Regions:
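Conserved hydrophobic/aromatic packing and binding residues within compact polymer-binding modules
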Residues: 13, 27-28, 38-41, 67
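Residues within helix-turn-helix
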Residues: 25, 36, 54
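Short, charged recognition helix plus adjacent turn
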Residues: 58, 68-79
Length: 79
């Protein structure tokens, strides 16, 4: 998976978290994820499972698509 995809996803997650005025710790609690994992997502270091994407979306009260804003489906994978 392209690192730019992970970075864009992480930036979106951070932007949405800050919009809700949540700390990483608060988001972690709401999404049932570890605070270190939230930090890794925001830095583009974590490749999330579908379940964790849904958890994050619910905790942020956003559409799943909002987390993928700016990510093109035509990007090639660089594994």
């Amino acid at each position: 998976m392209s690192k730019s995809i992970l970075k864009t996803f992480g930036s979106n997650a951070r932007r949405l978290r800050l919009r809700r005025k949540l700390t990483q710790e608060q988001l972690a609690e709401l999404s049932f994820l570890h605070p270190n994992y939230i930090g890794g997502i925001e830095r583009g270091e974590r490749n999330l499972s579908l379940i964790n994407i849904v958890r994050l979306s619910r905790a942020l009260q956003c559409r799943i698509g909002d987390l993928f804003a700016g990510i093109s489906t035509s990007e090639k994978s660089d594994n």
